[in-house]
Amino acid sequence: DVEKQQVKDVRTDITCSKRRDPWIVSLSAIIGENYCCKGYRYRRYGEQTNCIGFIGLEDDVEICVAVFKYAVDCVLSEIKNIKKENACYYSDYVKRLCNSYGYGFTAGVSEAFRKQQEENEQGWGLVLVMPKEVEEASQHLGHEQFQSRAQKHLQGSEYYRGFEEGTEFDPTKRLGEEATV
């Protein structure tokens, strides 16, 4: 069945930039890798906003996009709370809190996937390998570094809180809810 699957390129409606939600790029790379897909960003001519896309086998890319959208939704809903709770502070400070939480959540998700991978290797001897069709299909993508100033000015407690919540991220909760609706 896997051999018959086509490589699919799916562009999401999720956008970010170096100034707005820059953590989304890292999150897409981490989630893509853990679902045997390649996360990438693209920009329309003359725009600063990056759009996120994934390349992978049909089944993998569908799950990957659903998990990614759920993860972004989790972070954005918490960012909404952070903005509400800190409305009395300067906008630069609030933005730093929000980005810190986003980067922390991303690092936490990465750690959770790393632990899961370790358990799979020990228990089952399973190792995730990127399908060669996906590697070939994503060859044309560049490897340009995405660096945001926000990464250099993180706020410790929000980063840590995001990290903790990221390690507890469970995509099956949301995906299971959607399936039963």
Descriptions of predicted regions:
Residues 3-181:
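Extended, helix-rich structural scaffolds rather than catalytic motifs
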